[in-house]
Amino acid sequence: MKVYRNWLPIGFLLVALLPGCAALGQIQKPAVKPISPAELPSGNGWWRVRFRMNWPPDTDPVWHMDLYIAHQVIMPLLEKNKNDIYLWRFHRRAKRDGAGRQFTFYFYSPPRTAQQIFEALQSNPILIDTMSAGVIDDIVYDNPANIERPNIDDASDKNWPLSIQKTWPYYINGGSRMWLNLVAEIADQDLQDDPPASIEEIDSFYRQVDETVTELWQENGRHAFLHHLNAVFEYEPLIYWEKRFIDF
């Protein structure tokens, strides 16, 4: 009876807690939906503008003019069409192959918005001057009459799990937005005083902006970007490029 009396309060406690446990377990699966900035209407697609940058043989790729295009050309278009562009991102690459040195702007929108953006870019005086100066070799546009990538995951890497393909566009949109805002934050501080005029001055100006962005990335990227992303994933290590675990 002594043992029974010792366990009796615990038994009452467990009985009292059972209703609470049952309530905690009542997860309504249909109510759990992915978070998105807005309900994406049908009839949209991913579109690309590929800036094929000049890259002479036996030279290092020139990256800083991407910042000029992004800041002075793409950023105003994003602001003007912000209600019709649901997602967007940048991609930069330099490889000695058919595509070569390329700066690509992806955006998810209706075809009419893509058509308007393409027309605006084709008549943009900055791009015309940049091509005349030999900085850009060619600009390749998608065909807005044909939606080849209608799904949100159609511009993601097909080697990834489908769950990542569907959610990654929101992640890279945020990363691209921060990069562009960082470029603008740095550039706008100096543009107020003595803005560059000639292509040579523009080249020098955005080279300096690029160097500052690179310094910020190298000195603060581990904590500001990688560490806090690692924190979201519970500080779990990941398999790095060298096929070993690393955390931030």
Placement of each model-derived feature along the sequence:
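Sec-dependent bacterial lipoprotein signal peptides
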Residues: 1-19
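An acidic, charge-biased composition feature
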Residues: 17-248
